Amino acid sequence: YMIDEANIESHGMMFHKDETLANYPDWEVPFMQRMSRMIARDRNYSAIVTWSMGNESGYGKHFETLYDYTKKIDPTRRVQYEGGGYNSKSDIYCPMYARIWRLRQHVNQRDARPMILCEYAHAMGNSVGNFQDYWDLIYKYDQLQGGFIWDWVDQTFAIKDENQRDIWAFGGDMGFVGVVNDSNFCANGLIAADRTPHPHIYEVKKVLQYIHFEPLAFTPNKIKVTNWHDFIGLEGYTLRWAVECDGKTVQDGEMDFPKIAPRHSANIELPLKALPADGKEYFLTLRAFTKHEAPLVPKGHEVAIEQWELPSAPSAKTVQPVEGTLTVDRNNETLTVKGNNFQVA
């Protein structure tokens, strides 16, 4: 599914109602041209489900004109605009970088519109640390419908530094060319400019996986599997499981998933053997892999992973008696306990 966005952005003109271009009469025609030409070009692409009127351009009467025009010529699609906020001229509430409390707030108020974050999870450097917290809410409430990570790829280029080392360059690295640059703020992607994955993309992959695993209480060999796909079952995937202790695999196996319809769950029993009562920690790791090759996805590609500690009986520990006696000294200010080789006051 795609949201098609008009090339309307005037971030530098601020967002005040008296400064935004969206209220300047001279800019009404350019606004309309960019919106109408985009729709005329792309309206027959069925993957487009929503038209966006632009980005970071404040809010003004020109956006109200664009909304009414778009709904008139294409009543089949939704129309959104980030700067519209809770104004009526946006079918979707689509803020950027909303805090998690705002997601809860939207669900709890009476506005029935879906909420989609037009930008969130700013992926610059060691980032997306609270990504799971967002998706715990999104999975919980149908009204919360995801968002768009800013952004996908670092916008940098390869050059040699003064020591002839390869580096990724940005901003002023190209030398003074008479224009303002934003330093390294263009390097905020999930992948590098050469499409090498950054470490934090694996956090995103984990959170967005379509197969979810949960432990079932009091039954360590049974798990709950949820299929979050919209259209397909899990017949095309293989489940591999392993029990690990001290970093070593002590049990493992492979099995097919049962038939689980899209957006449905099922309980699965794993052939786990009883764990020894040795007081050690045992962890169950679950992985799902593709059975067949598909466009862009090879056979055997890992699509989901989960891990949790298994309940196990503690080892019987013998309490060794301690020789010697304790003495207690008490005065008006302190209480002192003394024993062999120690003192506590």
What are these regions (language model features)?
Residues 274-316:
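Terminal connector regions
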Residues 32, 222-229, 270, 284-288, ...:
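Buried hydrophobic-core signal for structured, non-transmembrane domains
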Residues 1-224, 228-249:
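Extended substrate-binding grooves/exosites of carbohydrate-active enzymes
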Residues 253-256, 298-302, 307, 340-345:
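Short amphipathic beta-strand/extended segments with alternating polar/hydrophobic composition
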Residues 244-282, 288-289:
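Intrinsically disordered, low-complexity Pro/Gly/Ser/Thr-rich segments with frequent PxxP/GP/PP motifs
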Residues 218, 261-265, 275-279, 298, ...:
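Surface-exposed coil/turn segments at beta-strand junctions on protein surfaces, enriched
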Residues 221-223, 239, 253, 268-270, ...:
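Hydrophobic residues positioned within well-ordered beta-strands of beta-sheet architectures
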